[in-house]
């Protein structure tokens, strides 16, 4: 049985073998001069953290920021998507500079640790400020530095804490699901904008100049149920996984809880048939699932054997993800028996789709060493008597590779009797060889830090792709402070990187046009 499980989990090993070194610990010191910058940033961030703002539920935070900006004398436009737009006049002496848009998004991915009581629709984020470590984290949940950090930095700029030319502030919504906020921006909203600085990147030593496209794959089916014939119901659950952003961290070899559990169930099914009651896991399409659970029904006599098989499966997974997923846990517990269960053929089809789908790294770039070109993440699964829904997010910097993956999903769904809908997600953002922003940022960074800033393309979607499509030729970059483990409860922001980004912007916003 153990050999069978290891074979079924081979696809998971493929990703782990491609894993680069994990993120380094936070570092850096904050000077007395920069303490005021950090203090104001923290105050802004805590204001945001007090307002629940999961994707698709940004009305409250949009209203709060609208009122905040209006109190500062800004004339704010709020569209139907709850995006916010307002202009900030230039500091005296800088009125002749070109109009620069500063753009961030208001929503966040809300994920809680196992056992942590958290309702993302009603509960604030409990921010932990550790001055000694120089970090912001959250108590038991994601922090929301993606992209609360960008919003908080912009808030400090709007307050007048640095000199600048004319600015247009753009706060968008729903970036984390389908970028519907950015897609609601019109050409009129971008009138006269010469440059756009997106503050949604997660490394202060890097300027991002290109990003990948993605798609939203939703696979569904109508439950086919039959009367249960087995008398013992159990819940098999996987938990304790790292999770994280499915673009930025997909190459780190982290375990996908849904795919791993489906692999375990497949192995059990081949050895001893069971009846599937439900299968669920994941909280966002673009977050690697940290946990998943299935309720199955078995013969009472098979209970001890099942627990042994699950133990073998856990051991196989720990071997596959050694050094990466040290907190991985698989458990078996009693569940309430169901009267109706999935017919075995459909249950097998669901598990086959989950395990046979592309998950993790698909191709690596042949141009940029170490860059993932194409990948996919099985982000959510909800299988019960009420319905079947499986959500995936493929990404690629190659339109051909993205189309190739989409074709594979369609074929696999058809083979397993499922329906599929594929929608366009983020747009590709190609690098601009004629950019003025990039060389200016390189010069400023070199002057301020005595080293070269990294110029990178990323394997993730940024709203810059939407703005590129809307205003072809717009000169754009993406920058941001140091954030690790975004989209996971371990999300951490390096406070020393806030002044670093601040001083970069401080010079950039007065040099453009000179």
Predicted regions and their residues:
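Acidic/His- and Gly-rich active-site-bordering loop/insert found
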Residues: 26, 30-134
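Gram-positive cell-envelope targeting signals
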Residues: 1-30, 245
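Zn-dependent metallopeptidase/amidohydrolase metal-coordination segment
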Residues: 33, 37, 41, 366-389, ...
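His/Asp/Glu-rich mid-to-C-terminal helical/loop segments that flank catalytic regions of hydrolases
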Residues: 188, 254-271, 300-303, 348-357, ...
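Acidic-enriched catalytic cores of C-N bond-cleaving enzymes acting on peptides and small amides
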Residues: 210, 227-231, 250-280, 300-375
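A short beta-alpha structural unit
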Residues: 46-50, 293-295, 329-341, 377-381, ...
């Amino acid at each position: 049985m153990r050999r069978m499980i290891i074979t079924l989990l081979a696809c998971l090993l493929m990703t782990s073998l491609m894993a680069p070194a994990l993120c380094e610990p936070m570092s850096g010191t904050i000077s007395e001069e920069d303490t005021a910058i950090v203090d104001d940033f923290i105050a802004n961030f805590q204001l945001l953290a007090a307002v629940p703002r999961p994707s698709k539920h940004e009305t409250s935070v949009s209203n709060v920021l609208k009122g905040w900006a209006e109190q500062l004398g800004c004339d704010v436009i709020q569209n139907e998507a709850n995006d916010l737009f307002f202009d900030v006049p230039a500091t005296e002496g800088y009125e002749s500079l070109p109009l620069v848009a500063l753009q961030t998004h208001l929503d966040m991915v809300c994920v809680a640790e196992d056992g942590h009581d958290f309702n993302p629709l009603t509960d604030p984020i409990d921010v932990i400020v550790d001055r000694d470590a120089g970090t912001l984290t959250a108590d038991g949940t994601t922090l929301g530095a993606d992209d609360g950090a960008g919003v908080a930095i912009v808030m400090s700029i709007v307050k007048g804490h640095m000199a600048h030319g004319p600015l247009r502030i753009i706060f968008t919504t729903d970036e984390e699901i389908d970028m519907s906020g950015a897609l609601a921006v019109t050409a009129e909203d971008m009138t006269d904008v010469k440059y756009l600085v997106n503050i949604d990147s997660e490394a202060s030593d890097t300027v991002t100049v290109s990003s990948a496209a993605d798609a939203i794959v939703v696979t569904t089916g109508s439950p086919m149920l039959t009367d249960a014939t087995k008398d013992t119901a159990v819940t098999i659950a996987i938990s304790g996984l790292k999770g994280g952003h499915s673009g930025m961290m997909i190459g780190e070899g982290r375990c996908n809880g849904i795919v791993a559990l489906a692999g375990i169930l497949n192995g059990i099914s081949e050895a001893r048939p069971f009846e599937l009651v439900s299968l669920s896991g994941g909280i966002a399409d673009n977050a690697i699932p940290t946990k998943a659970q299935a309720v199955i029904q078995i013969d009472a006599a098979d209970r001890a054997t099942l627990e042994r098989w699950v133990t073998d499966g856990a051991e196989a997974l720990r071997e596959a993800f050694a050094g990466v997923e040290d907190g991985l846990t698989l458990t078996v517990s009693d569940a309430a028996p169901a009267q109706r269960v999935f017919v075995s053929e459909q249950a097998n089809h669901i598990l086959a789709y989950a395990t046979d789908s592309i998950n993790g790294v698909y191709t690596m770039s042949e141009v940029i060493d170490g860059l993932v070109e194409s990948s996919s993440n099985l982000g959510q699964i909800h299988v019960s008597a009420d319905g079947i829904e499986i959500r995936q997010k493929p990404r690629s910097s190659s339109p051909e590779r993205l189309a190739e993956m989409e074709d594979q999903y369609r074929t696999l769904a058809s083979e397993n009797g499922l329906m599929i809908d594929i929608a366009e997600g983020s747009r590709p953002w190609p690098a601009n060889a004629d950019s003025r922003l990039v060389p200016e940022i390189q010069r400023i960074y070199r002057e301020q830090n005595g080293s070269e800033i990294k110029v990178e393309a990323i394997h993730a979607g940024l709203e810059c792709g939407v703005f590129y499509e809307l205003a072809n030729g717009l000169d754009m970059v993406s920058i941001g402070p140091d954030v690790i483990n975004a989209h996971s409860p371990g999300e951490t922001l390096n406070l020393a990187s806030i002044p670093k980004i601040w001083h970069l912007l401080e010079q950039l916003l007065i040099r453009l046009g000179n």
